UniProtKB/Swiss-Prot annotation:
Residues 135-189 are annotated as: Disordered. It is found in: Cell projection, Cilium, Flagellum; Cytoplasm, Cytoskeleton, Flagellum basal body. It comes from the Eukaryota. This is Intraflagellar transport protein 25. One of its GO terms (cellular component) is cytoskeleton. Ca(2+) binds at N27, D30, K32, T35, N127. Transmembrane segments: none annotated. The keyword Transcription does not apply. It comes from Chlamydomonas reinhardtii. GO terms for biological process: intraciliary transport. Residues 167-177 have a biased composition (Low complexity). The gene is IFT25. InterPro entries: Galactose-bd-like_sf, IFT25. Its main location: other. Keywords: Calcium, Cell projection, Cilium, Cytoplasm, Cytoskeleton, Flagellum, Metal-binding.
Amino acid sequence: MKDYAREENGGLVVMASCSDERFPPENMLDGKDNTFWVTTGMFPQEFVLRLESCIRVSKITTLSLNVRKLAVEKCDQDKPDQFEKVFEVELANRGDRLQTEVHQVNIRAKYLKFILLQGHGEFATVNRVSVVGGDDDGGGYDEPGGGYGSMQRQPSMGYGGGGGSAATGFAADPGNAAAGGGGGFEDEF
């Protein structure tokens, strides 16, 4: 299935609460595990992802480091001014290993807001975001009256080995800094 968060598929970060020119929010959408957006040391932090059009979303995946609590909200309108919660989750502390969160959802969205509510450390990173789904067919998702749609969480997985960490390894080898030894998420994203 198509990953609608990728830049080449129309995904665009239209707002980020913080930015470092060395680690811009666009890094989350480039398809690479060793590039990332980094927070500036305070929480909460958030970013809004605009999809090319309003689509049915079936899976949201994040690859991050040092995120303790994450919430995702959706908006299916042309103007991103009213969001509804999709899910909120607490992530395990994986040390210098990346956190992979996979959530099966059944929603319709044009915008997704990712809110990093708390971190395990002073800084946190989001290395990749994936939004999988299909064209908006006008129905069959978003439970009536629920606002949340439906969601099923798959267990969080850590990944990493020797090497640096994205939150502490800014001067490390860029090919090794984020994933503690490389990628390996091609099947997931």
